[in-house]
């Protein structure tokens, strides 16, 4: 053996692996397709991150709106329940804690408030462009109750609906038949005295 053959044996053995060392390779794919695949994966990841951030922001915004609505109604124990009529989608019902029940009838353009003891019912006509909030409605009913207690004016029962002529504050709505109130308001108020505010 001569010296030249020793040098050949000292070299590292040939590499028979499918992929080159230190590189990720996809067999039988050209380089430009590999780059395109990497770009597509990066774009999909960016879109997923953006959509996730938007959904998280929407969730936070919804929670904030619900919290503000609950705080505007009153105390934390105030519960609000919205029930939409399945047929006409014109009635909204709100339960204000244990203090009373409010029905917004958008078809008849009326709001009815019945306090918890259920001794009377307050009805208010609304304009479609200016629907009062629950807080404004309860304030108006409270002010009306204060005026009535100062005047000691008796309630006008539903049997006297036909006798009431005007729609002054404290009078019952005109019309002999309480059917003009609509089914939701008539169901809420029943046979208790009605006050038009």
Curated annotation (Swiss-Prot):
Pfam families assigned: BRICHOS, SP_C-Propep
GO molecular function term, any single one: identical protein binding
Gene Ontology biological process terms, A to Z: respiratory gaseous exchange by respiratory system
InterPro entries noted in UniProt: BRICHOS_dom (IPR007084), SP-C (IPR001729), SP-C_palmitoylation_site (IPR018051), Surfactant_protein_propep (IPR015091)
Gene3D superfamilies: 3.30.390.150
Alphabetized UniProt keyword annotations: Disease variant, Disulfide bond, Gaseous exchange, Lipoprotein, Palmitate, Secreted, Surface film
Residues excised as propeptide: 1-23, 59-197
Lipidation residue positions, type S-palmitoyl cysteine: 28-29
One GO CC term, this protein: alveolar lamellar body
Highest taxon listed in the record's lineage: Eukaryota
SS bond list: 120-148, 121-189
TM spans (from-to): none
Record's subcellular location: Secreted, Extracellular space, Surface film
Positions of the BRICHOS domain: 94-197
Keyword Cell cycle: no
Extra remark beyond the main annotation: Pulmonary surfactant consists of 90% lipid and 10% protein. There are 4 surfactant-associated proteins: 2 collagenous, carbohydrate-binding glycoproteins (SP-A and SP-D) and 2 small hydrophobic proteins (SP-B and SP-C).
UniProt disease link: Pulmonary surfactant metabolism dysfunction 2: A rare disease associated with progressive respiratory insufficiency and lung disease with a variable clinical course, due to impaired surfactant homeostasis. It is characterized by alveolar filling with floccular material that stains positive using the periodic acid-Schiff method and is derived from surfactant phospholipids and protein components. Excessive lipoproteins accumulation in the alveoli results in severe respiratory distress.
Function summary: Pulmonary surfactant associated proteins promote alveolar stability by lowering the surface tension at the air-liquid interface in the peripheral air spaces.
The name this protein goes by in its record: Surfactant protein C
């Amino acid at each position: 053996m001569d010296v030249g053959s020793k040098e050949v044996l000292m070299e590292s053995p040939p590499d028979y692996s499918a992929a080159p060392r230190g590189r990720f390779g996809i067999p039988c794919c050209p380089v430009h397709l590999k780059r395109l695949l990497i770009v597509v994966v990066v774009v999909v990841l960016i879109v997923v991150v953006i959509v996730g951030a938007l959904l998280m922001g929407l969730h936070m915004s919804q929670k904030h709106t619900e919290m503000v609505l609950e705080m505007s109604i009153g105390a934390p124990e105030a519960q609000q329940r919205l029930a939409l009529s399945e047929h006409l989608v014109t009635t909204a019902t709100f339960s204000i804690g244990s203090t009373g029940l409010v029905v917004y009838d958008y078809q008849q353009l009326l709001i009815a408030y019945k306090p918890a003891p259920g001794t009377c019912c307050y009805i208010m006509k609304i304009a479609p462009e200016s629907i009062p909030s629950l807080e404004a409605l309860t304030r108006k009913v409270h002010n009306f109750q204060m005026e009535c207690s100062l005047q000691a004016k008796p309630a006008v029962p539903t049997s006297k609906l036909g006798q009431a002529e005007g729609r002054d504050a404290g009078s019952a709505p005109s019309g002999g038949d309480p059917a003009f109130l609509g089914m939701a308001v008539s169901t809420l108020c029943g046979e208790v005295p009605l006050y038009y505010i």
